[in-house]
Amino acid sequence: HFYSQNKNSKPGDQDFISVMSLEDGNTITLDSQRAWHTPYGGNTVTLDEGESVIFKRSWTNSNHSLGTRIYSTNDKEMVVTSGSWGGRLKDNESSAQDIGIEQLVPVKALGKKYLISQSKTPNSTSGYRQGIVVVAVEEGSTSYTFNGGATQTLNKGGVRFHSIPGFNSTNTSSGPYAVI
């Protein structure tokens, strides 16, 4: 997803999560602190192999969708793609929008150590969303360090933002987590 602090929202701006089941009878649940629009009015849907569903969420008051959890309640396989329609890389920008799409990986494929390098944008960092690292915890209570700093702890679904101070950074943790 694109994350824009102080975003100027437009009616078409939205986040989405697309799920395709790889098995019959797959009960998919969306767990989020934010309000999502779902095809059946609820946050749970059952899909058969090859069937898919799209959840969408419109932007309101710069609220982001990071930390949203999508899972199979009966532990069946699925493919998940998520993204943002109308993301912006500059704060308070009403034009120059873009689309961001990510193919998610299973928690078992997440690592415990990441090397992160800063983007090489030609723009000044003032007001642009470059050089930001998002840490999203996937299981239980996870402790991590960012760039050798103090140990920080987040619970499942927790999200924290860090700025890269102009050089490569390293993240390590006690459990699996995603760096976005």
Residue ranges and their predicted role:
Residues 1-67, 71-180:
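Conserved functional hotspot residues at active sites or interaction interfaces
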